[in-house]
Amino acid sequence: MKDKQILKLTVGDWLTLSRPPFHTVGILPFALGTMLAWRLEQLFRLDIFFLGLAAVILIMLCTYQAGEYFDIREDTISRSIYASRFAGGSGIMPAGRLPARVPLYSSIVAFCGAGVIGLILQFGYQTGPYTLPLGIIGALSGFF
């Protein structure tokens, strides 16, 4: 598949590859933590919330894209036995709709984007000593 064809994939293909329904497993705990910080300490800043939310989404994208890349053989087997939303990945890679390198590269870009946001939150907004360590733990545990 040519590089121009990769860019012409539909928004639906990219959304399917990103698996947005499964982002709730990261977004809801982040929102709960935000609500707890507001409730217990009366701390809430909308700009920090949206930056943190963007970082969580990028970490989720990183893990899902890495899973698409590293699990293509297993996803192909899983889909041939039984197609499920919860097993076998998005189905984009086993169907051959993208070159195998695309989810790997997009995973790395998402990881770097989350890292940049983490640095901004840690050092620009001075959100505390746990911002980067928690983000790194989340990203690495999902990626590997």
Where are the regions a protein language model picked out?
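Membrane-embedded alpha-helical segments that form the functional core of polytopic membrane enzymes
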Residues: L28-L32, L36-I72, P129-F143
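The first (N-terminal) embedded transmembrane alpha-helix
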Residues: L17-A37, V109-G113
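Short regulatory "switch" loops immediately downstream of catalytic or recognition motifs
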Residues: M35-R39, I72-R73, G115-G124
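Cytosolic, membrane-interface loops and tails of multi-pass inner-membrane proteins
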Residues: K2-V11, F70-L98
